C-alpha cells in the first residue's frame, strides 16, 4: 500500500463527505484576531486549524475530494502556508508538489514574477523544470484575499507551459475581490469557508 493510499484510507475513515457541519467545524477552528497586524483588521489565523488534527484532516480531505477526478498532474503551493495544505493534497492525489517561493530560496534555475503589494512590489520564483508543458496544475493556498499572489503564481506556471484553471483555498475573504480577479484570468476558485471583512 502506498503512502497516498494510507492517507486516503485514514481520511475516509475519519471524514466522509463535505457537509455543512464539517465546514462549520473547519470555520470554527479558525481563530479571529482583532486589530492584527494593525487596527481595523480581523486576522483569520489558519494556524489554529493546523493545531486541530481533525480540522486539518477534514480540510485536506475536502480539497482532495473536490479535485480527485479533475485530472490534476501537479499541485503548486505558495510560500509559506500554501505548502502546509498543498503538499498533503498532492500526496493524496498521487501527483507531484511544486513550491513557489520568495526570491533566493530555490537552488536550481528559476523563473520569477513580480506582483503588487499594498506598499510596493514583491517577487515569487519557481524552478524552471518543475512544470512541464501540458501539466494541469492546481494552485493551493491557505487564504484568498486580493488574489495578487495567486495571479503571479499562475503567470509563472503558464510561462512554463502549464495549465491553471483551478485554485483552492481554506479561507476566502470575498470582500477583498480576489475571487473576481482570478475569475477574469480563467481561474475558478474553490474555498472551504468565507469570512466577511478584511
Curated annotation (Swiss-Prot):
Catalytic reaction(s) noted = AMP + diphosphate = 5-phospho-alpha-D-ribose 1-diphosphate + adenine
GO terms in the biological process aspect are: adenine salvage; AMP salvage; purine ribonucleoside salvage
Q: Report if keyword Transferase is assigned.
A: yes
This chain's protein is named Adenine phosphoribosyltransferase
The record's listing under Pfam families reads: Pribosyltran
Q: From the Swiss-Prot or TrEMBL record, what is one GO molecular function term?
A: adenine phosphoribosyltransferase activity
Q: Do you know which HAMAP family this protein is assigned to?
A: Aden_phosphoribosyltr
The similarity comment for this entry is: Belongs to the purine/pyrimidine phosphoribosyltransferase family.
Cellular component annotations (GO), alphabetically ordered:
cytosol
Amino acid at each position: 500500500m502506498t503512502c497516498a493510499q494510507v492517507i486516503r484510507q485514514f481520511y475516509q475513515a475519519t471524514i466522509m463527505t463535505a457537509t455543512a457541519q464539517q465546514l462549520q467545524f473547519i470555520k470554527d477552528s479558525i481563530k479571529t484576531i482583532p486589530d492584527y497586524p494593525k487596527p481595523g483588521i480581523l486576522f483569520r489565523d489558519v494556524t489554529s486549524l493546523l493545531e486541530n488534527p481533525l480540522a486539518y484532516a477534514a480540510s485536506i480531505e475536502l480539497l482532495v475530494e473536490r479535485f480527485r477526478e479533475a485530472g490534476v498532474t501537479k499541485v503548486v503551493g505558495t510560500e509559506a502556508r500554501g505548502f502546509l495544505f498543498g503538499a498533503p493534497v498532492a500526496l493524496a492525489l498521487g501527483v507531484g508538489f511544486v513550491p513557489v517561493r520568495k526570491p533566493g530560496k530555490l537552488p536550481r534555475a528559476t523563473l520569477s514574477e513580480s506582483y503588487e503589494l499594498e506598499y510596493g512590489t514583491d517577487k515569487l520564483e519557481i524552478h524552471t523544470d518543475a512544470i512541464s508543458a501540458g501539466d494541469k496544475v492546481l494552485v493551493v493556498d491557505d487564504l484568498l484575499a486580493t488574489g495578487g499572489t495567486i495571479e503571479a503564481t499562475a503567470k509563472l506556471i503558464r510561462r512554463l507551459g502549464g495549465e491553471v484553471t483551478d485554485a483552492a483555498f481554506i479561507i476566502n475573504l470575498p470582500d477583498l475581490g480576489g475571487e473576481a480577479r482570478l475569475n477574469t484570468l480563467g481561474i475558478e476558485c474553490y474555498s472551504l469557508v468565507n469570512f466577511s471583512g478584511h
